[in-house]
């Protein structure tokens, strides 16, 4: 029973991280669409600002830097030291993922990447069950 509770609690953290990060990226994308300056966190944890408009690729990099800099981590054990943050497969310099985190050991990991020229995808690895990875995915419009 305890392991079931722990498993449920870890999944709840993954869902919470996905929701929090999706809301943050979505709100910053909306502000960017109207030309606002955007506050973000650099990968080393310092606060900074960028001016809009920016390319979708640069916006995604700023968002990935923010997730890394805010020190989000997976609630699961980290399989490899290079996977030091929720959104990287290389710790230093940060190696951000360009697709959903598909490795079975990437439970709780999240990626932010370009879905197409006007859409950003936020994707979390919720669980690995019956030989398949289960994802939580959200799309964010980027104008």
Which stretches of residues belong to each language-model region?
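Amphipathic alpha-helical segments typified by the pilin-like N-terminal helix
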Residues: 1-22
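Periplasmic/extracellular, small/polar-rich flexible segments of pilin-like filament-forming proteins
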Residues: 30-143
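N-terminal alpha-helical signal peptides/signal-anchor transmembrane segments
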Residues: 17-36
């Amino acid at each position: 029973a305890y392991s079931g509770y722990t498993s449920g609690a870890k999944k709840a953290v993954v869902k919470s991280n996905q929701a929090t990060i999706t809301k943050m990226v979505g709100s910053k994308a909306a502000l960017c669409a109207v030309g606002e300056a955007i506050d973000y966190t650099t990968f080393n944890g310092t606060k900074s600002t960028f001016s809009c408009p920016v390319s979708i690729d640069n916006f995604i990099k700023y968002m990935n830097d923010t997730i890394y800099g805010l020190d989000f981590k997976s609630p699961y054990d980290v399989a490899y030291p290079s996977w030091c943050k929720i959104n990287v497969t290389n710790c230093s310099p940060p190696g951000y993922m360009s697709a959903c985190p598909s490795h079975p050991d990437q439970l709780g990991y999240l990626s932010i990447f370009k879905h197409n020229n006007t859409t950003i995808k936020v994707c979390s690895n919720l669980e690995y069950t019956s030989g398949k990875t289960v994802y939580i995915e959200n799309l964010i419009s980027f104008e």
